[in-house]
Protein backbone atom coordinates (compact mmCIF):
# COMPACT_ATOMS: atom_id res chain seq x y z
CA UNK A 1 0.00 0.00 0.00
CA UNK A 2 1.40 3.43 -1.00
CA UNK A 3 0.48 6.95 0.11
CA UNK A 4 -2.12 8.66 -2.04
CA UNK A 5 -0.66 10.57 -4.97
CA UNK A 6 2.75 8.91 -4.74
CA UNK A 7 4.13 6.17 -7.02
CA UNK A 8 3.84 2.59 -5.76
CA UNK A 9 6.62 1.64 -3.42
CA UNK A 10 7.13 -1.82 -4.95
CA UNK A 11 7.87 -2.66 -8.60
CA UNK A 12 7.90 -6.09 -10.27
CA UNK A 13 10.77 -7.46 -12.34
CA UNK A 14 10.34 -10.73 -14.31
CA UNK A 15 12.73 -13.52 -13.36
CA UNK A 16 14.40 -15.79 -15.90
CA UNK A 17 11.84 -18.59 -15.35
CA UNK A 18 8.69 -16.50 -15.35
CA UNK A 19 8.61 -16.09 -11.60
CA UNK A 20 8.64 -12.56 -10.10
CA UNK A 21 10.78 -10.94 -7.49
CA UNK A 22 10.30 -7.59 -5.87
CA UNK A 23 12.66 -4.77 -5.16
CA UNK A 24 11.55 -1.80 -3.10
CA UNK A 25 12.22 1.60 -4.66
CA UNK A 26 12.46 3.30 -1.28
CA UNK A 27 15.99 4.28 -0.20
CA UNK A 28 16.71 3.01 3.29
CA UNK A 29 19.22 1.90 5.81
CA UNK A 30 17.82 -1.65 6.39
CA UNK A 31 17.84 -4.58 3.94
CA UNK A 32 15.93 -7.88 4.31
CA UNK A 33 16.95 -10.82 2.07
CA UNK A 34 14.85 -13.98 1.45
CA UNK A 35 15.14 -16.88 -0.96
CA UNK A 36 12.67 -18.69 -3.22
CA UNK A 37 13.32 -21.61 -5.55
CA UNK A 38 13.55 -21.12 -9.30
CA UNK A 39 13.71 -23.61 -12.13
CA UNK A 40 16.95 -25.20 -13.34
CA UNK A 41 19.02 -23.54 -10.67
CA UNK A 42 19.41 -20.38 -12.75
CA UNK A 43 21.11 -17.44 -11.04
CA UNK A 44 19.16 -14.15 -11.08
CA UNK A 45 20.89 -10.76 -10.99
CA UNK A 46 19.19 -7.70 -9.63
CA UNK A 47 18.91 -4.73 -12.02
CA UNK A 48 21.04 -1.86 -10.75
CA UNK A 49 19.46 1.59 -10.50
CA UNK A 50 20.50 4.34 -12.92
CA UNK A 51 23.53 6.22 -11.71
CA UNK A 52 22.91 9.85 -10.90
CA UNK A 53 25.42 12.63 -10.55
CA UNK A 54 27.23 12.66 -7.18
CA UNK A 55 25.63 14.99 -4.67
CA UNK A 56 29.10 16.16 -3.66
CA UNK A 57 29.55 17.63 -7.16
CA UNK A 58 26.48 19.81 -6.63
CA UNK A 59 27.91 21.18 -3.41
CA UNK A 60 31.29 21.67 -5.02
CA UNK A 61 29.60 23.89 -7.62
CA UNK A 62 27.90 25.85 -4.82
CA UNK A 63 31.23 26.39 -3.04
CA UNK A 64 32.69 27.63 -6.32
CA UNK A 65 29.71 29.95 -6.69
CA UNK A 66 30.24 31.28 -3.16
CA UNK A 67 33.89 32.06 -3.86
CA UNK A 68 33.01 33.79 -7.13
CA UNK A 69 30.38 35.90 -5.41
CA UNK A 70 32.82 36.86 -2.67
CA UNK A 71 35.15 38.56 -5.16
CA UNK A 72 32.56 39.67 -7.74
CA UNK A 73 31.98 43.12 -6.26
CA UNK A 74 35.16 44.99 -7.17
CA UNK A 75 33.10 48.10 -7.84
CA UNK A 76 31.98 48.13 -4.19
CA UNK A 77 35.35 49.46 -3.04
CA UNK A 78 35.07 52.56 -5.27
CA UNK A 79 34.00 54.84 -2.36
CA UNK A 80 37.26 54.03 -0.54
CA UNK A 81 39.60 55.35 -3.22
CA UNK A 82 37.35 57.68 -5.25
CA UNK A 83 38.52 60.76 -3.35
CA UNK A 84 42.12 59.85 -4.31
CA UNK A 85 41.43 60.38 -8.01
CA UNK A 86 42.89 63.69 -9.16
CA UNK A 87 41.41 66.22 -11.57
CA UNK A 88 37.92 64.76 -11.16
CA UNK A 89 34.95 66.76 -9.87
CA UNK A 90 32.11 65.43 -7.75
CA UNK A 91 29.83 65.20 -10.80
CA UNK A 92 32.47 63.22 -12.69
CA UNK A 93 32.93 60.87 -9.73
CA UNK A 94 29.22 60.11 -9.82
CA UNK A 95 29.46 59.46 -13.54
CA UNK A 96 32.25 56.97 -12.85
CA UNK A 97 30.05 55.24 -10.27
CA UNK A 98 27.32 55.18 -12.91
CA UNK A 99 29.77 53.75 -15.48
CA UNK A 100 30.18 50.56 -13.44
CA UNK A 101 26.41 50.18 -13.41
CA UNK A 102 26.12 51.19 -17.09
CA UNK A 103 27.82 47.93 -18.01
CA UNK A 104 24.70 46.16 -16.72
CA UNK A 105 22.71 47.65 -19.62
CA UNK A 106 24.35 44.99 -21.76
CA UNK A 107 24.30 42.31 -19.08
CA UNK A 108 21.62 40.39 -20.98
CA UNK A 109 24.34 39.33 -23.43
CA UNK A 110 25.68 37.07 -20.70
CA UNK A 111 22.26 35.45 -20.31
CA UNK A 112 22.12 34.69 -24.03
CA UNK A 113 25.72 33.43 -24.04
CA UNK A 114 24.95 31.05 -21.17
CA UNK A 115 22.39 29.31 -23.40
CA UNK A 116 25.05 28.28 -25.92
CA UNK A 117 28.45 28.50 -24.20
CA UNK A 118 29.76 26.39 -21.26
CA UNK A 119 29.46 28.23 -17.97
CA UNK A 120 33.22 28.22 -17.17
CA UNK A 121 33.83 30.13 -20.40
CA UNK A 122 31.08 32.63 -19.53
CA UNK A 123 32.72 33.25 -16.15
CA UNK A 124 36.15 33.53 -17.77
CA UNK A 125 34.86 36.18 -20.21
CA UNK A 126 33.55 38.21 -17.26
CA UNK A 127 36.89 37.95 -15.47
CA UNK A 128 38.71 39.07 -18.65
CA UNK A 129 36.50 42.15 -18.90
CA UNK A 130 37.42 43.05 -15.32
CA UNK A 131 41.11 42.37 -15.94
CA UNK A 132 41.15 44.73 -18.93
CA UNK A 133 38.88 47.37 -17.38
CA UNK A 134 40.68 47.76 -14.08
CA UNK A 135 44.12 46.66 -15.31
CA UNK A 136 44.42 49.40 -17.92
CA UNK A 137 43.33 51.98 -15.34
CA UNK A 138 46.03 50.70 -12.98
CA UNK A 139 48.72 51.01 -15.66
CA UNK A 140 47.70 54.43 -16.98
CA UNK A 141 46.18 56.16 -13.94
CA UNK A 142 49.08 58.62 -13.58
CA UNK A 143 49.45 59.14 -17.32
CA UNK A 144 48.41 62.61 -18.56
CA UNK A 145 47.01 60.98 -21.69
CA UNK A 146 44.31 59.15 -19.71
CA UNK A 147 41.10 61.10 -20.27
CA UNK A 148 37.87 60.95 -18.31
CA UNK A 149 36.02 59.19 -21.12
CA UNK A 150 38.75 56.51 -21.08
CA UNK A 151 38.05 55.91 -17.39
CA UNK A 152 34.32 55.83 -18.08
CA UNK A 153 34.54 53.18 -20.83
CA UNK A 154 37.02 51.02 -18.93
CA UNK A 155 34.86 51.12 -15.79
CA UNK A 156 31.76 50.24 -17.85
CA UNK A 157 33.60 47.25 -19.36
CA UNK A 158 34.56 46.00 -15.91
CA UNK A 159 30.98 46.50 -14.72
CA UNK A 160 29.69 44.38 -17.58
CA UNK A 161 32.10 41.63 -16.56
CA UNK A 162 30.36 41.46 -13.18
CA UNK A 163 27.11 40.54 -14.97
CA UNK A 164 28.75 37.59 -16.73
CA UNK A 165 30.01 36.08 -13.48
CA UNK A 166 26.70 36.76 -11.71
CA UNK A 167 24.78 34.98 -14.48
CA UNK A 168 26.92 31.87 -13.99
CA UNK A 169 26.39 31.95 -10.22
CA UNK A 170 22.62 32.38 -10.51
CA UNK A 171 22.20 29.57 -13.04
CA UNK A 172 24.30 27.14 -11.00
CA UNK A 173 22.33 27.86 -7.83
CA UNK A 174 18.92 27.63 -9.51
CA UNK A 175 19.50 24.52 -11.64
CA UNK A 176 21.81 22.44 -9.45
CA UNK A 177 19.52 22.76 -6.41
CA UNK A 178 16.06 22.53 -7.94
CA UNK A 179 14.35 21.53 -4.68
CA UNK A 180 16.16 24.21 -2.67
CA UNK A 181 16.86 26.78 -5.38
CA UNK A 182 15.71 29.82 -3.41
CA UNK A 183 17.82 28.85 -0.40
CA UNK A 184 20.87 28.16 -2.57
CA UNK A 185 20.51 31.46 -4.46
CA UNK A 186 20.13 33.52 -1.29
CA UNK A 187 23.01 31.72 0.39
CA UNK A 188 25.39 32.17 -2.54
CA UNK A 189 24.49 35.79 -3.30
CA UNK A 190 24.91 36.72 0.37
CA UNK A 191 28.66 36.41 -0.10
CA UNK A 192 28.59 39.20 -2.68
CA UNK A 193 28.01 41.49 0.28
CA UNK A 194 31.48 40.58 1.55
CA UNK A 195 33.28 41.86 -1.56
CA UNK A 196 34.01 45.34 -0.25
CA UNK A 197 35.19 43.87 3.05
CA UNK A 198 37.50 41.39 1.31
CA UNK A 199 39.06 44.01 -0.96
CA UNK A 200 39.57 46.56 1.83
CA UNK A 201 41.11 43.86 4.05
CA UNK A 202 43.46 42.82 1.25
CA UNK A 203 44.44 46.44 0.62
CA UNK A 204 45.10 47.09 4.32
CA UNK A 205 47.06 43.86 4.63
CA UNK A 206 49.28 44.73 1.66
CA UNK A 207 49.68 48.53 1.88
CA UNK A 208 52.82 48.55 -0.29
CA UNK A 209 51.18 46.75 -3.19
CA UNK A 210 51.24 50.02 -5.18
CA UNK A 211 52.39 53.60 -4.74
CA UNK A 212 48.86 54.93 -4.06
CA UNK A 213 45.63 53.72 -2.50
CA UNK A 214 43.73 54.07 -5.80
CA UNK A 215 46.27 51.96 -7.70
CA UNK A 216 46.27 49.33 -4.95
CA UNK A 217 42.52 48.84 -5.26
CA UNK A 218 42.60 48.91 -9.07
CA UNK A 219 45.26 46.19 -9.12
CA UNK A 220 43.29 44.01 -6.72
CA UNK A 221 40.08 44.58 -8.69
CA UNK A 222 41.81 43.45 -11.89
CA UNK A 223 43.74 40.42 -10.66
CA UNK A 224 41.70 38.78 -7.86
CA UNK A 225 38.56 37.88 -9.92
CA UNK A 226 40.70 36.30 -12.66
CA UNK A 227 42.68 34.18 -10.19
CA UNK A 228 39.55 32.90 -8.43
CA UNK A 229 37.69 32.25 -11.69
CA UNK A 230 40.52 30.13 -13.10
CA UNK A 231 40.76 28.23 -9.79
CA UNK A 232 37.04 27.34 -9.54
CA UNK A 233 36.34 26.87 -13.28
CA UNK A 234 36.35 23.02 -13.14
CA UNK A 235 33.53 23.08 -10.57
CA UNK A 236 31.24 25.38 -12.59
CA UNK A 237 29.09 22.66 -14.16
CA UNK A 238 25.38 21.90 -14.31
CA UNK A 239 24.25 18.50 -13.02
CA UNK A 240 21.07 16.49 -13.20
CA UNK A 241 20.47 15.14 -9.71
CA UNK A 242 18.07 12.25 -10.23
CA UNK A 243 17.86 11.18 -6.59
CA UNK A 244 18.02 13.76 -3.83
CA UNK A 245 18.26 12.83 -0.15
CA UNK A 246 16.41 15.54 1.71
CA UNK A 247 18.02 14.55 5.00
CA UNK A 248 21.45 15.10 3.46
CA UNK A 249 20.31 18.38 1.93
CA UNK A 250 19.04 19.71 5.24
CA UNK A 251 22.16 18.69 7.13
CA UNK A 252 24.47 20.25 4.55
CA UNK A 253 22.53 23.52 4.49
CA UNK A 254 22.46 23.71 8.30
CA UNK A 255 26.24 23.30 8.39
CA UNK A 256 26.58 25.92 5.66
CA UNK A 257 24.38 28.33 7.62
CA UNK A 258 26.63 27.94 10.67
CA UNK A 259 29.75 28.59 8.58
CA UNK A 260 28.14 31.62 6.95
CA UNK A 261 27.10 33.13 10.28
CA UNK A 262 30.63 32.70 11.61
CA UNK A 263 32.02 34.37 8.48
CA UNK A 264 29.64 37.30 8.85
CA UNK A 265 30.48 37.70 12.53
CA UNK A 266 34.18 37.76 11.66
CA UNK A 267 33.54 40.45 9.04
CA UNK A 268 31.56 42.63 11.46
CA UNK A 269 34.21 42.33 14.19
CA UNK A 270 36.87 43.23 11.66
CA UNK A 271 34.87 46.25 10.48
CA UNK A 272 34.44 47.61 13.99
CA UNK A 273 38.13 47.13 14.76
CA UNK A 274 39.47 48.26 11.40
CA UNK A 275 41.49 51.06 12.96
CA UNK A 276 43.84 48.55 14.57
CA UNK A 277 47.46 48.00 13.56
CA UNK A 278 48.65 46.33 10.37
CA UNK A 279 49.39 43.08 12.20
CA UNK A 280 45.80 42.96 13.41
CA UNK A 281 44.60 43.50 9.85
CA UNK A 282 46.68 40.56 8.63
CA UNK A 283 45.35 38.32 11.38
CA UNK A 284 41.82 39.32 10.49
CA UNK A 285 42.45 38.58 6.80
CA UNK A 286 43.83 35.15 7.67
CA UNK A 287 40.79 34.30 9.82
CA UNK A 288 38.44 35.50 7.09
CA UNK A 289 40.29 33.41 4.49
CA UNK A 290 40.06 30.30 6.66
CA UNK A 291 36.31 30.76 7.11
CA UNK A 292 35.87 31.22 3.36
CA UNK A 293 37.75 27.94 2.77
CA UNK A 294 35.79 25.93 5.37
CA UNK A 295 32.75 25.30 3.05
CA UNK A 296 34.99 22.93 1.06
CA UNK A 297 34.59 20.46 3.93
CA UNK A 298 30.95 19.88 2.93
CA UNK A 299 31.56 18.42 -0.56
CA UNK A 300 34.61 16.60 0.82
CA UNK A 301 32.49 14.91 3.51
CA UNK A 302 29.78 14.07 0.98
CA UNK A 303 32.37 12.57 -1.37
CA UNK A 304 33.71 10.35 1.41
CA UNK A 305 30.19 9.18 2.22
CA UNK A 306 29.48 8.44 -1.45
CA UNK A 307 32.68 6.39 -1.68
CA UNK A 308 31.73 4.40 1.41
CA UNK A 309 28.26 3.75 -0.04
CA UNK A 310 29.82 2.44 -3.27
CA UNK A 311 32.04 0.07 -1.31
CA UNK A 312 29.04 -1.17 0.71
CA UNK A 313 27.00 -1.61 -2.47
CA UNK A 314 29.78 -3.59 -4.14
CA UNK A 315 30.04 -5.92 -1.14
CA UNK A 316 26.27 -6.45 -1.14
CA UNK A 317 26.27 -7.36 -4.84
CA UNK A 318 29.11 -9.83 -4.26
CA UNK A 319 27.08 -11.51 -1.52
CA UNK A 320 24.10 -11.76 -3.88
CA UNK A 321 26.16 -13.39 -6.64
CA UNK A 322 27.71 -15.84 -4.17
CA UNK A 323 24.32 -17.32 -3.20
CA UNK A 324 23.47 -20.92 -4.08
CA UNK A 325 22.50 -21.74 -7.64
CA UNK A 326 19.21 -23.23 -6.52
CA UNK A 327 17.95 -20.03 -5.02
CA UNK A 328 16.75 -16.67 -6.29
CA UNK A 329 17.00 -13.51 -4.36
CA UNK A 330 14.29 -11.17 -3.23
CA UNK A 331 15.59 -7.91 -1.80
CA UNK A 332 13.18 -5.68 0.05
CA UNK A 333 14.58 -2.39 1.29
CA UNK A 334 12.51 -0.87 4.06
CA UNK A 335 12.67 2.44 5.84
CA UNK A 336 14.61 2.60 9.09
CA UNK A 337 12.11 2.73 11.92
CA UNK A 338 13.86 5.73 13.44
CA UNK A 339 13.72 7.74 10.18
CA UNK A 340 10.21 7.11 8.94
CA UNK A 341 9.59 10.66 7.80
CA UNK A 342 10.76 11.61 4.31
CA UNK A 343 10.25 14.90 2.56
CA UNK A 344 8.76 14.78 -0.91
CA UNK A 345 8.42 17.65 -3.29
CA UNK A 346 4.89 17.69 -4.61
CA UNK A 347 4.62 18.86 -8.18
CA UNK A 348 2.83 22.05 -8.93
CA UNK A 349 -0.77 21.62 -9.89
CA UNK A 350 -0.85 24.89 -11.78
CA UNK A 351 2.26 25.29 -13.95
CA UNK A 352 3.71 28.75 -13.90
CA UNK A 353 3.53 30.85 -17.04
CA UNK A 354 6.90 31.34 -18.70
CA UNK A 355 7.45 34.91 -19.89
CA UNK A 356 10.41 36.25 -21.81
CA UNK A 357 11.57 38.54 -24.59
CA UNK A 358 9.41 41.44 -25.68
CA UNK A 359 6.46 39.85 -23.90
CA UNK A 360 8.15 40.73 -20.61
CA UNK A 361 8.12 44.45 -21.44
CA UNK A 362 4.36 44.35 -22.07
CA UNK A 363 3.57 43.15 -18.55
CA UNK A 364 2.43 45.81 -16.01
CA UNK A 365 3.94 43.64 -13.26
CA UNK A 366 7.37 44.00 -14.85
CA UNK A 367 7.26 47.80 -14.73
CA UNK A 368 5.99 47.79 -11.15
CA UNK A 369 8.87 45.46 -10.32
CA UNK A 370 11.34 47.57 -12.33
CA UNK A 371 10.55 50.89 -10.63
CA UNK A 372 10.04 49.49 -7.13
CA UNK A 373 13.52 47.93 -7.39
CA UNK A 374 14.96 51.19 -8.74
CA UNK A 375 13.42 53.24 -5.92
CA UNK A 376 14.78 50.91 -3.22
CA UNK A 377 17.63 48.51 -4.00
CA UNK A 378 19.21 50.72 -6.65
CA UNK A 379 18.79 53.79 -4.45
CA UNK A 380 20.61 51.96 -1.66
CA UNK A 381 23.46 51.13 -4.04
CA UNK A 382 23.75 54.81 -5.01
CA UNK A 383 23.98 55.72 -1.32
CA UNK A 384 26.73 53.14 -0.80
CA UNK A 385 28.60 54.44 -3.86
CA UNK A 386 28.57 57.92 -2.31
CA UNK A 387 29.68 56.81 1.16
CA UNK A 388 33.18 58.16 0.60
CA UNK A 389 31.98 61.67 -0.16
CA UNK A 390 29.30 61.54 2.55
CA UNK A 391 31.86 60.51 5.20
CA UNK A 392 34.30 63.15 3.99
CA UNK A 393 31.68 65.90 4.13
CA UNK A 394 30.92 64.97 7.76
CA UNK A 395 34.58 64.99 8.72
CA UNK A 396 35.10 61.23 9.10
CA UNK A 397 38.67 60.27 8.27
CA UNK A 398 38.36 56.46 8.09
CA UNK A 399 36.16 55.96 5.02
CA UNK A 400 37.15 52.29 4.79
CA UNK A 401 35.56 51.65 8.20
CA UNK A 402 32.19 52.87 6.99
CA UNK A 403 32.47 50.93 3.72
CA UNK A 404 33.44 47.74 5.59
CA UNK A 405 30.49 48.23 7.94
CA UNK A 406 28.04 48.57 5.05
CA UNK A 407 29.58 45.51 3.37
CA UNK A 408 29.33 43.35 6.50
CA UNK A 409 25.71 44.25 7.20
CA UNK A 410 24.93 43.88 3.50
CA UNK A 411 26.22 40.33 3.83
CA UNK A 412 23.76 39.57 6.63
CA UNK A 413 21.00 41.25 4.64
CA UNK A 414 21.66 38.97 1.69
CA UNK A 415 21.77 35.97 4.02
CA UNK A 416 18.41 36.75 5.66
CA UNK A 417 16.23 35.49 2.74
CA UNK A 418 17.98 32.11 2.76
CA UNK A 419 16.94 31.57 6.40
CA UNK A 420 13.38 32.56 5.55
CA UNK A 421 13.29 30.19 2.57
CA UNK A 422 14.76 27.28 4.49
CA UNK A 423 12.39 27.41 7.45
CA UNK A 424 9.32 28.27 5.38
CA UNK A 425 10.00 25.22 3.19
CA UNK A 426 10.37 23.04 6.30
CA UNK A 427 7.00 24.23 7.59
CA UNK A 428 5.27 23.64 4.26
CA UNK A 429 4.63 27.33 3.57
CA UNK A 430 5.97 29.67 0.90
CA UNK A 431 6.82 33.34 1.40
CA UNK A 432 5.99 35.83 -1.32
CA UNK A 433 9.14 37.48 -2.61
CA UNK A 434 7.35 40.70 -3.51
CA UNK A 435 5.89 40.86 -0.01
CA UNK A 436 9.37 40.39 1.45
CA UNK A 437 10.72 43.21 -0.72
CA UNK A 438 7.96 45.59 0.37
CA UNK A 439 8.64 44.85 4.05
CA UNK A 440 12.35 45.60 3.54
CA UNK A 441 11.79 48.93 1.81
CA UNK A 442 9.95 50.56 4.74
CA UNK A 443 12.89 50.57 7.23
CA UNK A 444 15.15 51.69 4.40
CA UNK A 445 13.03 54.81 3.86
CA UNK A 446 13.17 55.54 7.59
CA UNK A 447 16.97 55.24 7.52
CA UNK A 448 17.24 57.95 4.85
CA UNK A 449 15.20 60.33 7.00
CA UNK A 450 17.36 59.35 9.99
CA UNK A 451 20.39 60.68 8.08
CA UNK A 452 18.99 64.20 8.38
CA UNK A 453 20.40 64.16 11.92
CA UNK A 454 24.05 65.36 11.80
CA UNK A 455 25.33 62.96 14.49
CA UNK A 456 27.92 60.34 13.52
CA UNK A 457 25.99 57.66 15.40
CA UNK A 458 23.02 58.18 13.10
CA UNK A 459 25.30 57.90 10.07
CA UNK A 460 26.66 54.54 11.24
CA UNK A 461 23.19 53.25 12.20
CA UNK A 462 21.62 54.34 8.92
CA UNK A 463 24.50 52.86 6.93
CA UNK A 464 23.97 49.51 8.67
CA UNK A 465 20.20 49.59 8.02
CA UNK A 466 20.53 50.62 4.37
CA UNK A 467 23.31 48.08 3.80
CA UNK A 468 21.19 45.29 5.32
CA UNK A 469 18.01 46.18 3.41
CA UNK A 470 19.82 46.75 0.11
CA UNK A 471 21.57 43.39 0.40
CA UNK A 472 18.33 41.61 1.26
CA UNK A 473 16.38 43.24 -1.59
CA UNK A 474 19.12 42.36 -4.08
CA UNK A 475 19.08 38.74 -2.93
CA UNK A 476 15.28 38.43 -2.85
CA UNK A 477 15.00 39.94 -6.34
CA UNK A 478 16.88 36.99 -7.85
CA UNK A 479 14.16 34.57 -6.73
CA UNK A 480 11.37 37.09 -7.34
CA UNK A 481 12.26 37.23 -11.05
CA UNK A 482 11.70 33.50 -11.51
CA UNK A 483 8.65 33.61 -9.23
CA UNK A 484 6.99 36.31 -11.33
CA UNK A 485 8.10 35.38 -14.84
CA UNK A 486 9.24 31.75 -14.71
CA UNK A 487 12.65 30.07 -14.63
CA UNK A 488 12.99 29.17 -18.31
CA UNK A 489 14.18 32.62 -19.43
CA UNK A 490 15.60 33.62 -16.06
CA UNK A 491 19.10 34.48 -17.32
CA UNK A 492 17.79 37.06 -19.79
CA UNK A 493 14.86 38.31 -17.68
CA UNK A 494 16.94 39.14 -14.62
CA UNK A 495 19.55 40.96 -16.66
CA UNK A 496 16.76 43.03 -18.23
CA UNK A 497 15.49 43.84 -14.74
CA UNK A 498 18.87 44.94 -13.38
CA UNK A 499 19.16 47.42 -16.25
CA UNK A 500 17.26 49.66 -13.82
CA UNK A 501 20.49 49.92 -11.81
CA UNK A 502 22.43 52.05 -14.32
CA UNK A 503 19.33 54.14 -15.04
CA UNK A 504 18.74 54.79 -11.34
CA UNK A 505 22.44 55.26 -10.67
CA UNK A 506 22.63 57.97 -13.33
CA UNK A 507 19.50 59.81 -12.18
CA UNK A 508 20.00 59.61 -8.41
CA UNK A 509 23.79 59.95 -8.53
CA UNK A 510 23.82 62.95 -10.85
CA UNK A 511 21.07 64.68 -8.86
CA UNK A 512 22.96 64.24 -5.57
CA UNK A 513 26.19 65.48 -7.18
CA UNK A 514 24.36 68.51 -8.58
CA UNK A 515 22.99 69.41 -5.13
CA UNK A 516 26.44 68.84 -3.59
CA UNK A 517 28.16 71.10 -6.11
CA UNK A 518 25.49 73.77 -5.70
CA UNK A 519 25.96 73.76 -1.93
CA UNK A 520 29.74 73.96 -2.33
CA UNK A 521 29.43 76.77 -4.88
CA UNK A 522 27.23 78.77 -2.53
CA UNK A 523 30.10 78.66 -0.02
CA UNK A 524 32.67 79.60 -2.64
CA UNK A 525 34.60 76.33 -2.26
CA UNK A 526 35.39 73.33 -4.46
CA UNK A 527 34.24 70.85 -1.81
CA UNK A 528 31.40 70.93 0.70
CA UNK A 529 31.71 70.28 4.43
CA UNK A 530 28.96 69.75 6.98
CA UNK A 531 25.73 67.79 7.33
CA UNK A 532 23.85 70.25 5.11
CA UNK A 533 25.78 69.09 2.01
CA UNK A 534 23.54 66.03 1.59
CA UNK A 535 20.53 67.08 3.66
CA UNK A 536 18.25 67.82 0.69
CA UNK A 537 19.48 64.67 -1.03
CA UNK A 538 18.57 62.45 1.93
CA UNK A 539 15.09 63.97 2.17
CA UNK A 540 14.43 63.35 -1.53
CA UNK A 541 15.85 59.83 -1.38
CA UNK A 542 13.66 59.01 1.62
CA UNK A 543 10.53 60.20 -0.20
CA UNK A 544 11.56 58.22 -3.29
CA UNK A 545 11.95 55.07 -1.20
CA UNK A 546 8.44 55.58 0.20
CA UNK A 547 7.11 55.65 -3.38
CA UNK A 548 9.04 52.46 -4.13
CA UNK A 549 7.48 50.80 -1.09
CA UNK A 550 3.98 51.68 -2.31
CA UNK A 551 4.72 50.34 -5.80
CA UNK A 552 5.98 47.07 -4.34
CA UNK A 553 2.84 46.74 -2.20
CA UNK A 554 0.75 47.07 -5.37
CA UNK A 555 2.92 44.42 -7.04
CA UNK A 556 2.47 42.14 -4.04
CA UNK A 557 -1.32 42.48 -4.20
CA UNK A 558 -1.29 41.68 -7.92
CA UNK A 559 1.06 38.69 -7.63
CA UNK A 560 -0.07 36.97 -4.43
CA UNK A 561 -1.24 33.95 -6.40
CA UNK A 562 2.34 33.14 -7.41
CA UNK A 563 3.24 32.07 -3.88
CA UNK A 564 0.60 29.36 -4.07
CA UNK A 565 2.22 27.93 -7.20
CA UNK A 566 5.50 27.18 -5.49
CA UNK A 567 6.31 23.58 -4.57
CA UNK A 568 5.09 22.48 -1.14
CA UNK A 569 7.03 20.00 0.94
CA UNK A 570 5.08 17.30 2.73
CA UNK A 571 6.15 14.76 5.30
CA UNK A 572 4.85 11.24 4.87
CA UNK A 573 5.33 7.82 6.39
CA UNK A 574 6.65 5.25 3.94
CA UNK A 575 5.00 1.87 4.13
CA UNK A 576 5.84 -1.38 2.35
CA UNK A 577 3.15 -3.98 1.94
Q: How would you describe each model-predicted region?
A:
Residues 97-115, 404-418:
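Central cavity-lining transmembrane alpha-helices of secondary-active solute carriers
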Residues 85, 162-186, 387, 472-485:
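Intracellular juxtamembrane helix-capping segments at the cytosolic ends
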Residues 10-14, 18-46, 236-362, 368, ...:
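Long, low-complexity inter-transmembrane loops of multi-pass membrane transporters
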Residues 128-144, 443-454:
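C-terminal ends and interior cores of transmembrane alpha-helices
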Residues 146-164, 458-472:
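Hydrophobic core of transmembrane alpha-helices in multi-pass small-molecule transporters
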Residues 78-79, 271, 358-407, 508-509:
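Extracytoplasmic gate region of multi-pass secondary transporters
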Residues 85-86, 113-114, 203-211, 273, ...:
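Interfacial helix-cap and linker-helix signal at transmembrane-aqueous boundaries
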Residues 369-371, 375, 379-381, 394, ...:
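C-terminal transmembrane helical hairpin of 12-TM major facilitator-type secondary transporters
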